[in-house]
Amino acid sequence: MEIQTSKALSDVQQFRYELLQWCGNVEDAEKANTFVMGNDEKPVQAQLPKSGNMEDGIYLVHADGKATLFELEYTKDDNMDSEIVAIGLKMGGFGIKIALHDEANGDGITLTTKSNGDLKADQDYYIDKYDDAVADMDGARNTNHLRSILNKQIKLADDWYIPSLGEWYRIFINKKAINAALEFAKGDKLQDRWYWTSTEYSATSAWILSLGDGYTYHWSTKASYTYRVRAVSAFIF
């Protein structure tokens, strides 16, 4: 059996590949892997490397500042050395941490208590073209512009913010794996519902994204329409 791939295999993938070659079939390879690893084996935790060589994927972010690359094979019987506080996503140079729960216990809420300013200085924050909105990757900056009028039910911890439309799309295309990690971490899955983004369309409205079908819309009045909010933070690697 020979597998050709142009992508370098990780250590775990190389081990599984060699095990499959040795056993000759997937069923026996899975049994051998279970025997070797054992049900009580703890997934390896590694301090986030500073070299930028961190593998792309979904990570379990721990309270002690470490992160574990999440494997879909993990079960509730896999133990962790410390509490999981967020889910990390790395895609090339892009990284983001996703909170374990929606704000306001998952209720649909308004984004703000009133409209934002419409002064010349505010205009730099408003994006009315789809292509530009999708390219918006600065949710932290956007949230700072909203912070003084933000709904009080949105209780953002330090350095946490509401994702921009561009950041949300990167989360959306990885939703299946992120939700598996959220379930493992005893968090709440991202729902097939509308979520607020921090990308403002105008003084009165902001862009929203449906996690059910990826559709986005911009005529949503920030102070009256109600949608879900999920906070994020920078994932430094």
Stretch-by-stretch model annotation:
Residues 2-156, 223-237:
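Short, compositionally biased
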Residues 99, 162-163:
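Hydrophobic core segments of beta-strands in well-ordered, beta-rich domains
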Residues 3-6, 17, 39, 158-159, ...:
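C-terminal, surface-exposed recognition/capping segments
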